[in-house]
Amino acid sequence: MGNTIVLFEVTVKNGRMDDYLKMSGSLKESLANAEGFIRAERFSSLATEGKLLSMSVWENEECVSKWRNFAVHRMAQKHGRMNDFADYKITVVTPVRSYTMIDRAAAPADSNAYLEV
């Protein structure tokens, strides 16, 4: 399970969402081809207008570090800080446990007992 997950919470400045989405979209191909990249998803906050959460999953933290320092990503970081971001927070985590509705091997025993699985 040793993947590394990066959570990028960003609040985009008023009137800058289209620019931010265009800029982040321009990274898609580079991201897809980055060493160790597994997948990414973006979610929009229901509570805070203009706030997004991007979650990317990587093979390990070394791959995250390489992406962080990739030239086009660095340029996008600077552009975002200077133009698009009102605020942001980055959290890097490794999973404690992961299970699904079907694969319950790592699920807590009390949950499996309650669900009778």
Where are these regions (language model features)?
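Glycine-rich, flexible loop/turn motifs
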Residues: R81
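Short S/T/G/P-rich N-terminal loop/turn motif that feeds into the first structured element of a domain
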Residues: M1-L52, E61-N69, D84-V117
